[in-house]
């Protein structure tokens, strides 16, 4: 069972979401906890799966992957074997950076980051040759207006805010 997050956990998570490279000394100063207490809390949050990973976020434009494609997929097949095959192909494709099963008219949504339309087309051909799909529609992003990896966290009490 996962423990309930307290105000200090929330403050630490908020700080790390904004800067995962923050030192224990910086976290200590901003939370009012000792560096050792911050370290222990982070280890517990990692063990509980609250903190999944610490990564460096890259700018897709600056590494030559400036085209964002949302691929809407409809299918008639929904068996576990079919899904396992589909998942295998998606997992083999690093261009697919997000993958969702949906409720509604569209069954699956993929988000791709590619260098060119021809790169998207190569992935499209690979996908439709290996998985039975009813309809595949691509939506090409013209401009990213907002992108965030920061999740909204519950408000902390006044006590934690005064200490931070």
UniProtKB/Swiss-Prot annotation:
Residues 24-43 bind DNA. It holds the Pfam family AsnC_trans_reg. SUPFAM superfamilies: Dimeric alpha+beta barrel, Winged helix' DNA-binding domain. One of its GO terms (biological process) is response to amino acid. InterPro entries: ArsR-like_HTH (IPR011991), AsnC-type_HTH_dom (IPR000485), Dimeric_a/b-barrel (IPR011008), Tscrpt_reg_AsnC-like (IPR019888), Tscrpt_reg_AsnC/Lrp_C (IPR019887), Tscrpt_reg_HTH_AsnC-type_CS (IPR019885), WH-like_DNA-bd_sf (IPR036388), WH_DNA-bd_sf (IPR036390). GO terms for cellular component: cytosol. One of its GO terms (molecular function) is sequence-specific DNA binding. Residues 5-66 form the HTH asnC-type domain. It comes from the Bacteria. Keywords: DNA-binding, Repressor, Transcription, Transcription regulation. PANTHER family: DNA-BINDING TRANSCRIPTIONAL ACTIVATOR DECR (PTHR30154:SF17), LEUCINE-RESPONSIVE REGULATORY PROTEIN (PTHR30154). Represses the secondary, H(+)-coupled glutamate uptake system (Gluemp) genes. This is Glutamate uptake regulatory protein.
